[in-house]
């Protein structure tokens, strides 16, 4: 009984109780004092699991309560304790992003390399959560960075999958394996390309990620970048591949031959110009060598659904991707154009040819997607177009922009399918725009170079303290005028090209009027984007022209100042002061202009955003809206033309000013020194130019304010549009409700008037009744003494009732207390009953066990009885055998006697003696055997008796039970055999 009680006590300490519930609640609330008091009580443990497998220690880690952790550690909690899923407190703290808690656990010697059931460390969970501080703390405490979980992921792969770039950078800086693979063979670079994180891709490439690695399905990083549809990542990878290819290729002639072969074998859409992709990889070469496989490969599930439901959106997205790639390619080509030597130019040609080949591949894929339904006849035309476009790009011709549209017009025959024609026209327009933009960029670069030269000349002139001769000044003035003329002519040529492009766009818009409403809307949207791009380029050109003009004016003012300095010949210090003041003024002006230009650009971007929102909010009506969009486009083109005319006027004015300046210079050359009055006049002119510059600044500010006003107006329009679109229905509802309310109010007024009339009649009646009642009351008034007596009697009754009420309240409280006591007694009785029931259940279990033991003992007794019966049978058999043996002995004796009698007569004495001895020996042996059998039988009977007694007493050994069971089975087998 004592051992049973001890067992019950041990089980009670491990069971969940109220203190454990309170401990969980205190940890949930972060009450460290209550946690300390509860842990001091018996039975409460911080690592005890509840029904869900939670513990108070792990809950504190999930909540990040550091004070509770300190209290638990002082009470001797096991820091390495795990919950039902194998998570330690360190894992849970990292999972929930609590760096302070992690730091404390590591200080209390919690192992940083501990692993849960999934093979993950705390660093895996910190990387998945994206907590940079937690990752830093774990790395400082030497948590394994390249340890893989059951899925084959290291913390770097987990951070990339969850899109935490900062954690990725930190892990890479602390020695994470860049080329580590998961179970599917995917590297960190592949996962970063799939998630579309350009920063992480760049960091991985810098850390030496291998771009040629392939996963278990044979896909490389480029494939995953195409899945994410991120053009920036694709261009990054392609540029890296091209760099690696350039480093690896020993000779450039072989590469040139390979590219020329590929470009001759290739067929596809018209090629986009000056694309930066790298030389083709061996996988792409295999794809190119089998064009049938490219065209016959089916699209994936997502792509087929996309093209089936929204083909127009797919076309527009592909065109936009091409534009992005073209913009990237122009930047790459501009950077490549800086090469000067012949060897570098040859390298540049090889690179450009490789990039052209890769672009044709990409364009072919896009065209196959867009023209899946178009007839096969268009493929030959498109291949001819791509071949022609590649040749025109690679041929060194001076007039590229003029040759391209004619070649496209010759090489592109009319196709029956409308989608094919629209895409081809768009490609042609985009090519023309890109060419014109490229030429504009070149010219702007040349103008900037000229400006730099002018600035250098000015600086050299400033450094010279000696006075300049009039001849040198005139030469500088003539050089400036020539340069200004050159820049003006270049600018006019660029503007003419822009105008021609705009006219071509107009013609393209007019030619597409016969198409369907949806195609019109798509074309108008595309041209909208092109016009916006042109607008931006025009504005840049305008701003640069204004800057050029301002620079020219500055140069003129500086020249005038130098001439004045020559006339007056002031000291070098005064010159330097003047120079510094003018430089500071010019710098301030430039800063203000740059600031205003930035604000102007921001305002324009906001206007574009508002226009886009307005377009998205306006209802789309196919034919009417296309006409409206065309009108707006025409207006925008007219505005652009106006701006161009204004620019040309500005340049003419600048030219006129230059001519005036030349005339003045020629007059000044006549005389060696400038007169004081003339000097004052020149000062006046410089002040005028300054005022003009300030006026231009004010104009810029006014333009900026106008743009801001336009912005506010557009915002108001958007708000008004939103309010009207939402509140028209509400307004109608309000009007209807107001009308109904007015009708109801009118009806109520009528009813109220009627009610008033009735009430006035009732008031008159009541006044009459009041007068009558007053008269009756005056007749039936009670005297004051009787009234006071009644009041006293009523007060006494009220007091008595109040006393009774108090007594009843007291009785009620007593009854409540008795009820509470009864309830407590009932609850105690219930608890006792539950305890008794548990004891009863335990006793019943013991009784059932004893009954089972009793049944087993009865079965064993029955078996022993059977064994005793068999033993009695064996004894009887033995008795029978003994009797038979005695009979045989008697027979032998008789035979001996007979033989002894015969021996005297027949044989000699020797033989008789020998036979007698033999027989005697046999008899002795038989007697010995009989004695041994009796002994064995007695021993067996005694053993059986002992075992029967033990079985009756319930003290039989297990070995004996096993032997008895074996005997019973043997007896059963013998009976079955019989």
UniProtKB/Swiss-Prot annotation:
One of its GO terms (cellular component) is anchoring junction. Disruption phenotype: RNAi-mediated knockdown in testis tissue results in misorientation of spermatids, indicating loss of polarity. Transport of germ cells across the seminiferous epithelium is disrupted leading to partial spermatid entrapment in the epithelium. Premature spermatid release is also detected in stage VII tubules. F-actin is mislocalized and found on the convex side of the spermatid head, in contrast to wild type where it is tightly restricted to the concave side. PALLD localization is also abnormal, showing more diffuse expression away from the spermatid head. It is found in: Cytoplasm, Cytoskeleton; Cytoplasm, Cytoskeleton, Stress fiber; Cytoplasm, Cell cortex; Cell junction. Residues 248-299, 388-424 are annotated as: Disordered. A motif (Nuclear localization signal) lies at residues 270-276. Signal peptide: none annotated. ANK repeats lie at residues 18-51, 52-81, 85-114, 118-147, 151-180, 184-213, 217-247. One of its GO terms (biological process) is cell differentiation. Residues 395-414 have a biased composition (Low complexity). GO terms for molecular function: actin binding. SMART domains: ANK (SM00248). Keywords: Acetylation, ANK repeat, Cell junction, Coiled coil, Cytoplasm, Cytoskeleton, Differentiation, Nucleus, Phosphoprotein, Repeat, Spermatogenesis. The modification Phosphothreonine is found at residues 249, 295, 297. Residues 282-299 have a biased composition (Polar residues). Residues 349-374, 427-945 form a coiled coil. The modification N-acetylmethionine is found at residue 1. The modification Phosphoserine is found at residues 11, 281, 286, 293, 300, 304, 318, 327, 329, 340-341, 358, 511, 514, 666. Detected in testis where it is highly expressed in germ cells, and also expressed at lower levels in Sertoli cells (at protein level). Residues 248-259 have a biased composition (Basic and acidic residues). Plays a role in actin regulation at the ectoplasmic specialization, a type of cell junction specific to testis. Important for establishment of sperm polarity and normal spermatid adhesion. May also promote integrity of Sertoli cell tight junctions at the blood-testis barrier. Interacts with PALLD. Associates with actin. However, does not bind F-actin directly. This is Ankycorbin. It comes from Rattus norvegicus (Rat). The lineage of its organism: Eukaryota, Metazoa, Chordata, Craniata, Vertebrata. The gene is Rai14.
